[in-house]
Amino acid sequence: MTASLLSGKPLAKLIQQQAQTEAKVLAEEGTCPTLAVVVATEDSSTHWYVRSIERAAEAAGINCRIIDVGHDATEQVLIAVLKDLSAELSVNGIILQTPLPPGVRTQELVKYIAPEKDIDGANPLSLGLLAVGERAFAPATARAVVEILDHFEIPVAGRNVVVVGRSTVVGKPLSLLLLQKDATTTVCHSKSGALGTYTKTADVVVVAAGRTGLLTGADVSEHSVVIDVGTNVLSDGSLTGDVDEASVRPVAAALTPVPGGVGSVTTALLLLHTAEAAREQSRATSAPVLTR
């Protein structure tokens, strides 16, 4: 048995088309959806990723502004930039791209992203709204996992789903989204002990821990659907996930590839969220700007 590959590219294309359609309608109404991406690093892989967002946005008819504040930017500088973007009417969506300079606190900075422009669900207020089932943008990667499961008609209601990783970017918000879909959700982390104890009996395993080869074939069963969220850059520049594909694919029922899986859907959702944010803001029904 060899696991079916769940490519994210066809789904990403569909979502990009949705974003493009909405952007076109907005443009006809006099609104050009605009995404601002704040960068504060010299990391080449980060700049490559940001450029890929810029290209995808251009193709969808969404304006993308890259604000590079430099790798030595202070927390105060970044706060000022985020405040300005949150107040700027022409900006509809804001992303604070990591990594950030040493000593800069990500969780402090994201509080200054206006919730109605928080298209990657970074502000803790967005996570809080998500927790109580209120309308808010979920982190794009977390939503991408759910969209993939829906696209391939993989049911989660009443099923055992294990999420490996508890970050505020993927693990925590994803567990909330899965609970909303009535999944029986378990979140594993560095203190959980032997991973296979939890994953081997799971119907769906989502791995988002940032560790190459964390999940192996010994940790899954023949009915497991494995979603690999990991994006790890190897010394040769190639990209790999958190799953040891060589050992997992002969065992599991289905597996998302890296690259070409969750990542492509994530980028498409950032564009769709931007278009949706622009629509909400054009109706003047968005939440008030968070101030401090």
UniProtKB/Swiss-Prot annotation:
GO molecular function terms noted in the UniProt entry: methenyltetrahydrofolate cyclohydrolase activity; methylenetetrahydrofolate dehydrogenase (NADP+) activity
Binding site for NADP(+): 165-167, 190, 231
Name of one Pfam family that matches: THF_DHG_CYH
The entry's keywords: Amino-acid biosynthesis, Histidine biosynthesis, Hydrolase, Methionine biosynthesis, Multifunctional enzyme, NADP, One-carbon metabolism, Oxidoreductase, Purine biosynthesis
Pathway note: One-carbon metabolism; tetrahydrofolate interconversion
Quaternary data: Homodimer.
Function: Catalyzes the oxidation of 5,10-methylenetetrahydrofolate to 5,10-methenyltetrahydrofolate and then the hydrolysis of 5,10-methenyltetrahydrofolate to 10-formyltetrahydrofolate.
Protein known as: Bifunctional protein FolD
Species annotation: Arthrobacter globiformis
